[in-house]
Amino acid sequence: MGSLSGLRLAAGSCFRLCERDVSSSLRLTRSSDLKRINGFCTKPQESPGAPSRTYNRVPLHKPTDWQKKILIWSGRFKKEDEIPETVSLEMLDAAKNKMRVKISYLMIALTVVGCIFMVIEGKKAAQRHETLTSLNLEKKARLKEEAAMKAKTE
């Protein structure tokens, strides 16, 4: 029985070694095809005539009239004449985010003002005894009278 467990142990370690060697010898290259590397440090062959592309430049965008207004309203520029011909997308995103925050603050302020206005109007209506209960009772009485008048005419 001892030799059987030793055989399993040897087979398992052999399998792990083979798996490690196979996975390290097959690697993806830049062109996404499998290439066999013999365990040495080999670099993929690149054509020497191919120009290397560098993407260090920030992509620029010509702003529309609406985007120019957003740049001015957000406080990035004072006048439309100061806005350059092309601006970075990050600058536009920052201006849009600033405008979103300003609009949300405005909406919060309008909501608070609306709530205060409704509280004041509700207190005035309560002083005039215009509650929902009294309004509903008056409406039901009026509907009953109309139904009685309609029944008399028929």
Curated annotation (Swiss-Prot):
Induction: By 17-beta-estradiol. By hypoxia. One of its GO terms (biological process) is positive regulation of apoptotic process. It is found in: Mitochondrion membrane. Proposed to be involved in regulation of apoptosis; the exact mechanism may differ between cell types/tissues. May be involved in hypoxia-induced cell death of transformed cells implicating cytochrome C release and caspase activation (such as CASP9) and inducing mitochondrial permeability transition. May be involved in hypoxia-induced cell death of neuronal cells probably by promoting release of AIFM1 from mitochondria to cytoplasm and its translocation to the nucleus; however, the involvement of caspases has been reported conflictingly. Keywords: Apoptosis, Membrane, Mitochondrion, Transmembrane, Transmembrane helix. It comes from Homo sapiens. This is Protein FAM162A. Residues 76-102 are annotated as: Required for proapoptotic activity. Interacts with HSP90AB1; HSP90AB1 is essential for FAM162A mitochondrial localization and pro-apoptotic activity. Interacts with VDAC2; the interaction is probably involved in inducing mitochondrial permeability transition.
